[in-house]
């Protein structure tokens, strides 16, 4: 086999690692930081029309003030279900009804809750690191197969170094995102 037959798809590895980072950012967006944001409701599903539905598909989510989220529910019959879904979501928000509009005042976080949220953020980041390392392992396993099939030692070392450099860069992005999220959570 020639060296051209041993072509590791670094773009695919990077795409998969970036997917882990995108997933982490989505998880971070769902963490309540004491500031109102529409994204904090993304994980909340409403039992609407016989299936679990995201809140943004049953109403308009707005952030009129820094500590207030409003949901204008389109179907009046779903207002109670949306309210119930928010109460049971574990976000620690107490919905207030005003006709078809549900108001969600966002309380300030106490010190203990802030520390809990930083630990949750650290767990999310660790899951992302593990996912990135799993992609790295897949790439290294592929390189081992190439080496067994006749790839030169030098080429194997070059490719291994590239995979490791890519992994290190992606892990640094995770660490930076975690640091930013933790400082956002701890901000009073």
From Swiss-Prot:
GO cellular component labels: cytosol
Superkingdom of the source species: Bacteria
Coiled-coil positions: none
GO molecular function: ribosomal large subunit binding
A Pfam family annotated for this UniProt entry: RRF
Chief location of this protein within or outside the cell: cytoplasm
Protein localization: Cytoplasm
UniProt keyword Protein biosynthesis present: yes
One biological process term in Gene Ontology: cytoplasmic translational termination
Signal sequence bounds: none
Keywords in alphabetical order: Cytoplasm, Protein biosynthesis
Stored PANTHER family: MITOCHONDRIAL RIBOSOME RECYCLING FACTOR PSEUDO 1, RIBOSOME RECYCLING FACTOR
Listed HAMAP family: RRF
UniProt record similarity statement: Belongs to the RRF family.
Its biological purpose: Responsible for the release of ribosomes from messenger RNA at the termination of protein biosynthesis. May increase the efficiency of translation by recycling ribosomes from one round of translation to another.
Name of this protein: Ribosome-recycling factor
Organism: Dinoroseobacter shibae (strain DSM 16493 / NCIMB 14021 / DFL 12)
Record gene name: frr
């Amino acid at each position: 086999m020639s060296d051209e037959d041993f072509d590791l798809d670094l773009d695919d590895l990077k795409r998969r690692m970036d997917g882990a980072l995108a997933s982490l950012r989505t998880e971070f967006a769902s963490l309540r930081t004491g500031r109102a944001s529409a994204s904090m409701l993304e994980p909340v599903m409403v039992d609407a029309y016989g299936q679990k539905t995201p809140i943004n598909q049953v109403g308009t989510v707005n952030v009129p003030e820094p500590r207030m989220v409003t949901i204008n529910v389109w179907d009046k019959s779903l207002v109670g279900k949306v309210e119930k879904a928010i109460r049971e979501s574990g976000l620690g928000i107490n919905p207030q009804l005003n006709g078809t509009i549900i108001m969600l005042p966002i309380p300030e976080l106490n010190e203990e809750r802030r520390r809990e949220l930083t630990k949750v953020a650290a767990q999310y980041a660790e899951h992302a690191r593990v996912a990135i390392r799993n992609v790295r392992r897949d790439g290294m396993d592929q390189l081992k197969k190439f080496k067994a099939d006749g790839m030169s030692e030098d080429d194997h070392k070059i490719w291994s170094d590239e995979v490791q450099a890519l992994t290190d860069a992606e892990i640094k992005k995770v660490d930076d995102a975690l640091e930013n999220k933790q400082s956002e959570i701890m901000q009073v």
